[in-house]
Every structure is written in C-alpha cells, then in structure tokens.
Amino acid sequence: MEFFTYRLPNGIRGIHRQVKSNVAHCALVINAGSRDEHPDQYGLAHLTEHAFFKGTQRRRAWQVNCRLENLGGELNAYTTKEDTTLHATVLRGDFAKAVELLADVAFRSTFPERELEREREVIFDEINTYKDSPADRIYDDFEDLLFAGSALGHNILGTKAALARYRSEHIHAFVRRTHTTDQMVFSSIGNIAPRRIEAIAARYFADMPATVRSFCRTAPAPVAPFERNIARHTHQSHCIVGARAYGILDPKRLPLALLVNILGGPSANSMLNVTVREKHGLSYSIEGSYTPYGDAGIVAIDFSSDHDNCDRCLELVRGQIDSLRTRRLSTRRLALAKKQFVAQLAISMESNEGYMLGAGKSYLVHSEVDTMEEVYRKISDLQAGELLEVANEVLASPSLLVYR
C-alpha cells in the first residue's frame, strides 16, 4: 500500500506513507492563504503563520521554539497564496511529541500582543530583504498585474503600514474564518504503522470541534495581455514573460508542466538555457515555471541580463515560444523529454519531507494521491499534439514586465 488515508470525526483528513527511516516528518496542511484575506487584511495570513510560534494556552514562545529543537528536531511553517503549512521533523521515537506540538500551535495559539510587536519587526526586515531582490520582486509584481483585481493579485507579505494595524483579535478572527477543520490535512511519513499514526492523530486532533468553511473563493476575472517597463535603476535588466494558465484541477496541467520543463526547466539542455545562455551568452540565469492554483495558474519565464542585451534576450525567448507553438515535437525528442521529466520527479521524491508535503497538498486538493507509478504512466501517455495544443492555448499572447 502506497498511502494510508483516514478521516477524524471533526473532518480533519489524514494521509500517511510508511517508509524505512529513523526520521519521521509530519505536517498540518491548511487550505488558507493570502487569497483568503479581505482587501483590508493583506499580509495577515503570513503574519498568522509567524504568530503561531509566539505562545499557546500551554506554552510560552520559547517553549514552543525549544520543544523539538531540544530533541534535535525541527518545527517550521510557510504560507502561500492558498495554503498555510505547519510541519515538523523528528526522530521516529519523538513523533507523538511533534504531533502534540503541531496541534497545540494550530488550535491553542494565543497570539500575545507583546510577541506580535517583536514579530512585526522581523517581517519588516523580511519585506526589506524582498525589496532588495529584484528577481523576487518582479515575479510578485508580474503576478499582481496578471491577476489584477482578484484575491490572487497581491503580495503575500503585505505592507508595513497594514501590518502595523493588525492586533491579536484580527488574527483570531482570520483563523476562525479560514482555518476550519474541513480544510485541513494531516500528512506524515516515517517508519510507523498506519494504525499507530491514526491513533496519535486522533489523540491530539480529534478533540478539536468540527468547523466548516462558510465562504467560497472567487475565480479571477480575465485580464488583457500587457507590456510594462518599470525604471528600477538596477545593475541589470530583469524580465518576465508569461501568461495565465490552467488551474490545479485541469487535466491539461500535466502536458503544460512537461512543456514548461522542455522550454525552461532546470536542466542545462532546456531550450532557453541552450539558446540564451550557452549559444549566445546573454544571461547567467533563465528559467521557466508553472504554478497552478485552485482555479487558475501562471506560466512565467524570467531572466536577467545586461541592459543592452535585454531586447535580444526577449527576441530569443519569443522565438523559442513560437517554435513550440508551430512545430510538433518529434517522437524521439518527446520520448527524451518525458524520460528526463520522470527522472527529475523521481529524484525530487527522494526527499521524504518533500514527498510528505506534496502528498498532503495533493490530498487536500484532489482527495487522492497518485502513486509515482501512476504519475509515470500519465507522463508516458502524453502525445506531441497535446503539447502543441497547450502551447497555443497558454502562450499565444504572453504578457511582459521589465525592470530596467
């Protein structure tokens, strides 16, 4: 059995994979992120994630932070536009302690004002660091333009002015509205029997009252393609070419993921790396990405170059996109691309922690998780015509943002 799944009486779902390892990983994946903020709450989901570590009804902040660290383990969290994830890594024998701590911070955090004052300063520094990184900032600016007017069209970090307004009661209200038990998955991996996992999860999570989300997310409205140049006075030009794409439930997401990997994946033989970097020497770093959300997605190609080379890079990028839109991949080239993609996925799954987090997200969204064999079969079945189709549907009229 690849995965063991279960459901607690309060609606929290669980998924576990038993593997041979002395280390165990677990996570509470919550279907709540920055897109669930009201317009006057931007940055609140991320602040909430930080505030989870600042004290509970049972523990002070230092006790939360030291509970697993003293055991050689780790407690961490992250926020995306759609999810908040609390996760822990410990030795197998300390697994129950990790679960108890996750339950404590997820359901009994008090968000004390004195701790929030200090943590705001930490996030202010995070915002400053982000502003000093044009490669990070341009992606968020591009996404804001691409999803303008929607809940996906704002930065996760928020602004200093907004963060300065938030108090403990704002976080409590946000958690009550968005962190409902029907929107949670407890994911785990380690050398622990499935029924033992379910018993531990029930011990620490099942006494939490069942709650149900009372709102629905709104899909982003269409946005016309755009081209923007912004003066940032950076040492290099930074550029993104991209477009709206399929959401995570769309069956076309898999051929699109393969297409983006061929065009600008991490390998040295991706089309853009070969053309822009290796053949012409115009950019040190150029890559493509595909990020699917629940009801939409984004494909983006980003690079940096000397100011004088930016237009030539754009010309080459557009040429490679046009090639994928007008020429069907040969049988041999498609077979090699699929083999490469499968191998990359297999290597990435060697990380038990990454595998656990991915399984939790997949189970949250799809209520099932494909085995790696099923994923490999789906990739193997892809046809050149499918890639040609998605290239024309997604990349026919890409948008552009340039920092100069």
Where are these regions (language model features)?
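Generic preference for hydrophobic
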Residues: 14-16, 28, 186, 241, ...
